[in-house]
């Protein structure tokens, strides 16, 4: 057993058994270090785990003390995710929250709106009011994305929760336009890096003319991905004269044909896997061969990405890990409301499948170090 885990089990066992009572001061980090022959960093990691579970609190200059059970248990958190069920990433994020040890003393109230965009906006505001009425300890909020009045609705929801003094942790995206920032913690991925990685991979495959395609009313995560896409083009000396980032439906055959004629792209980065799947169907319907004529990369790595007509190369995000990090952020926010707003960004990784044309390079002996799936 790792040393920090031994320290954690020792302290956690003392709290659970009652040997360490509410208000009791934990042994100092120096004392615990001597007891377990562990460094102060190792001890601090164990204490931080207890703090994230809401079992202890740090008092500057006074040490770490056990919280009362009334404060440590029985809290209710709201999940305000209007597009739960419509966007695949949110279900594993929520499951990550529910399964983490940090959440065991607490309850999660699931709220979703799976109707039309307009109805989803109304239902989202109603859910926020419901969480306020139930005196939720905190709310995990994934801002509306595709509704026409999404900006106004998202701001009204945030203001209502702020007035009720209910902490908010944003999931996946901010409700402010990129690169602006709200006053709330956000847990997601580094979207700029994801866009950069997707474009850089296609450039590394030999494609020089690239395009980017995303929905016109998408979340600000898409703006960040476009920024990363542009950066990769500049860094690789492939920046075109005209903007290669297009906004529109990947199912619009006229738009897709226009993009092909205007840009003659050898590779296309899609804002997400859903857009990539729709684009793939449209291109195949137009007689375009993938990846021989056009290479495609998505972002998300949803379940069906490997099952598409041409298995999709994509950027994988750790959705369960986002859920765990979001719960930890909420508990820390409750303990330290004075902390500045933070972006907690989990790493992403490239998953190589057929749509990027890597197998074409493999046949010619040019493939180096690719992580195939």
Language-model segments: residues:
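Short, Lys/Arg-rich nucleic-acid/phosphate-binding segment
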Residues: 25-28, 58-72
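Short beta-strand elements in bilobed, periplasmic/extracellular small-molecule ligand-binding domains
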Residues: 101-118, 212, 230-250
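Alpha-helical recognition/docking segments in bacterial nutrient-uptake
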Residues: 9-13, 17, 31, 35, ...
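Hydrophobic alpha-helical segments within soluble ligand-binding/sensing domains
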Residues: 7, 174-177, 181-212, 250-257, ...
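N-terminal helix-turn-helix
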Residues: 19-58
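Short, solvent-exposed amphipathic alpha-helices that sit
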Residues: 88-104, 194-197, 220-239, 278, ...
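An alpha-beta-alpha
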Residues: 196-238, 342-356
């Amino acid at each position: 057993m790792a040393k920090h885990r031994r320290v954690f089990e020792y302290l956690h066992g003392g709290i659970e058994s009652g040997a360490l009572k509410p208000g009791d001061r934990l042994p100092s980090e120096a004392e615990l270090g001597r007891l377990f022959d562990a460094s102060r960093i190792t001890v601090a990691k164990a204490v931080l785990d207890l703090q994230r579970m809401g079992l202890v609190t740090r008092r500057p200059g006074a040490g770490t003390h056990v919280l009362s059970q009334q404060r440590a248990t029985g809290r209710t958190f709201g999940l305000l995710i209007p597009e739960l069920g419509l966007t695949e990433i949110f279900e594993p994020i929520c499951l990550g929250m529910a399964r983490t040890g940090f959440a065991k003393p607490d309850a999660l109230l699931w709220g979703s709106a799976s109707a039309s965009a307009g109805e989803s906006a109304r239902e989202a505001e109603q859910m926020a009011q419901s969480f306020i009425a139930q005196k939720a300890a905190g709310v995990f909020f994934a801002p509306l994305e595709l509704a026409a009045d999404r900006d106004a609705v998202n701001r009204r929801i945030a203001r209502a929760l702020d007035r009720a003094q209910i902490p908010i942790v944003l999931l996946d995206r901010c409700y402010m336009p990129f690169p602006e920032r709200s006053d709330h913690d956000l847990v997601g991925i580094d979207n700029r890096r994801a866009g950069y990685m997707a474009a850089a991979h296609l450039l590394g495959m030999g494609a020089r003319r690239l395009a980017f395609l995303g929905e016109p009313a998408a979340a600000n995560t898409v703006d960040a991905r476009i920024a990363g896409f542009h950066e990769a083009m500049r860094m690789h000396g492939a920046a075109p004269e005209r903007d290669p980032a297009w906004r529109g439906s990947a199912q619009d055959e006229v738009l897709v044909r226009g993009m092909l004629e205007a840009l003659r792209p050898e590779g296309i980065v899609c804002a997400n896997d859903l857009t990539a799947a729709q684009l793939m169907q449209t291109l195949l319907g137009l007689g375009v061969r993938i990846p021989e004529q056009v290479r495609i990369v998505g972002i998300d790595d949803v379940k069906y990405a490997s099952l598409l007509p041409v298995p999709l190369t994509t950027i994988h995000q750790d959705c369960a890990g986002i859920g765990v990090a979001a719960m930890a952020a909420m508990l820390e926010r409750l303990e330290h409301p004075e902390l500045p707003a933070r972006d907690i960004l989990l790493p992403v990784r490239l998953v190589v499948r057929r749509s990027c044309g890597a197998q074409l390079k493999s046949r010619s002996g040019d493939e180096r170090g690719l992580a195939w799936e």
